[in-house]
Amino acid sequence: MTELARLKFYATQPHTCSYLPEEQATTLFLDPSQPMDVQVYADLSDMGFRRSGDHLYRPHCQNCSACVPARIPVNLFVPDRQQKRILKRNADVQVQSARPAFTEEYFDLYQRYIEQRHADGDMFPPSREQFSTFLVRDLPFSRFYEFRVDQRLLAVAVTDLLPNGLSAVYTFYEPDEERRSLGRYAILWQIAEAARLQLQAVYLGYWIKNCKKMNYKTQYRPIELLTNQRWVTLY
């Protein structure tokens, strides 16, 4: 029996989908008593799982398949003209890696981001407890990539370093710096970092065609979508 075959999973009861409110969602979770092994995590990422806090999960909906796992094949990616402009616009940004931690600097930025960009979502209102539970986990593969200009914190990309790629868990950034397109820049930086580390992919989570907040991911080409248990490349 393989390691994955020994794993246990639990499905939630149907609940209102946070992305498509007209739909009922069911979520499949890895047994929380299972240690968060980085190789198991990597293997499950290839099967469409994501991390939130201490949990690995995947949509398991009976009547909907709108959430499509997406990843960028690093060696094939070429930035388009707009993405090159974003890279040039942020040439003054310095990025450094930090261990996950709670600081007032992080939380102040997170709070402004949620209040100004996601006040209509289920993460509003932001709280210190929510921030810590969601993002500040003591996991050896988790990183806070800090994006700074002259020591001013502009963005944090919470990223998991896996054997097969980088998993972009969550990014929050300065909402007043709209011209920089910091969310897009963070993804472009993670692609470059994955290439530097000779990793295969950047896992972006779920692409949802009819959800404006989630359909931007296909702007990065080529992109691979997990369809019928097979990664399909879109150019």
From Swiss-Prot:
Catalyzed reaction equations: N-terminal L-glutamyl-[protein] + L-leucyl-tRNA(Leu) = N-terminal L-leucyl-L-glutamyl-[protein] + tRNA(Leu) + H(+); N-terminal L-aspartyl-[protein] + L-leucyl-tRNA(Leu) = N-terminal L-leucyl-L-aspartyl-[protein] + tRNA(Leu) + H(+)
GO CC terms, sorted: cytoplasm
EC number assigned by the record: 2.3.2.29
Keywords: Acyltransferase, Cytoplasm, Transferase
One record GO biological process: ubiquitin-dependent protein catabolic process via the N-end rule pathway
GO molecular function, one term: leucyl-tRNA--protein transferase activity
Role noted for this protein: Functions in the N-end rule pathway of protein degradation where it conjugates Leu from its aminoacyl-tRNA to the N-termini of proteins containing an N-terminal aspartate or glutamate.
Source taxon at top rank: Bacteria
Pfam families attached to this UniProt entry: ATE_C, ATE_N
Annotated compartments: Cytoplasm
Organism: Pseudomonas savastanoi pv. phaseolicola (strain 1448A / Race 6)
Similarity section: Belongs to the R-transferase family. Bpt subfamily.
The protein's name: Aspartate/glutamate leucyltransferase
InterPro entries, per database record: Acyl_CoA_acyltransferase, Asp_Glu_LeuTrfase, N-end_Aminoacyl_Trfase, N-end_Aminoacyl_Trfase_C, N-end_Aminoacyl_Trfase_N
